[in-house]
Amino acid sequence: MSAEPARGYRNTVIAAACLGLVWLGDALIYVVLPLYPAAFGVDITTIAILLSVNRVIRIVGYGWVSPLARKFGANTLTAAACVAGALSTLAYGLLSGFALLFIARLMWGAAYGVINLTNTAYAYGDGRRAGMHVGLNRAVSTMGPVLALGLGGWLVTSVGPRWVFVIYGLAGLLAVPLALTLPRLRHSGSEVPARSVERWKVNPHNVLFFVVALGADGVFTATLSTLLADLIPVTSALIGAGLLLASQRLLSVILSAVGGPLVDRFQAGRLLVPCSLVIAAGLVLIALGHVYAGAVILIVARVIFAIVGPIIAAQQSEDRIGAIAAYSTWSDVGLAAGAFLGIMGMEWAGYPATYATLSAMTAAATLWFKLRAVPPPAHA
């Protein structure tokens, strides 16, 4: 109790604020670009590429974050990424055409990859009350997209679909001086750099991270509107879509803030397996036609898993950023694959078979993790 105030929440909140500020443009581009392609000088057929290429580049770049953070300091690296992220948002408003926007999306993908990893490293810190810190970090950072989407529709109707990104880009530049106030985080407890984590190593942890992201993130997100199409009237209103997405983000904020202390109370290692099994249960409920119940269970369990997962990953090595990079790599690959496989699975096999298969895969990966996972090293 007496040692905890020495750490405090300063770094956790500042790092989260940096991500939230530069996240504004990316959150809104998914709503605005499909509705106003001509305003950005792009064809409707290229929108999918622009909205997905950022995920590809961040997967490729995760491996560079840990060595660069050791060399230059995590705060300097975060500040540089904030510059790139803010400039990418400004580019949405000031540039046009597929080629230039493609470069801007590549910049954002690289920037997000850096800030996402350093954010979690700052939140994890020395491991004390990691659940509370990671949950708070995610809650604060997600307020950026909540505000971007909540205000975005009104701003677009007021200043137009391009100038809104200039406003958001200028706001993102505020993250740069904030990032420089963070500590360097060169090493994690010793002057000797920790052994680099093998990002692509197939082990029970990484497979479970992949499978959960595949089903609960990728497939679920890509197919939810199709699942609900017969139950909820579809609206294309810009403000309505923005507020709907903002409400989903706000729910994530609340659940992250509440879930963090729960993770500390019950310990991350004890929650990973039950949380994964609950996700499997949510998937099978959707397969059986209980879409509402399954969706609620998935959303809640996935938020808790998003807190538990990086904590478990960080405990595996003194190279915190490298370990979190491995977690993010497998999660992002699952997310990207799920977005594709979900649509194809719905088309070829229908949603009952698709979701039943995902449930079985999640249960199997959880069982493998339970039987084969090794405990974290003593220093973690």
Where is each model-derived feature located?
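Symmetry-related core transmembrane helices of the 12-TM Major Facilitator Superfamily/SLC fold
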Residues: 164-180, 355-370
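Helix-to-loop junctions at the C-terminal end of transmembrane segments
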Residues: 61-73, 156, 254-267, 346
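Central cavity-lining transmembrane alpha-helices of secondary-active solute carriers
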Residues: 49-66, 243-258
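Structural signature of the two symmetry-related core transmembrane helices
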Residues: 76-90, 169, 270-285
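Intracellular juxtamembrane helix-capping segments at the cytosolic ends
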Residues: 114-127, 304-318
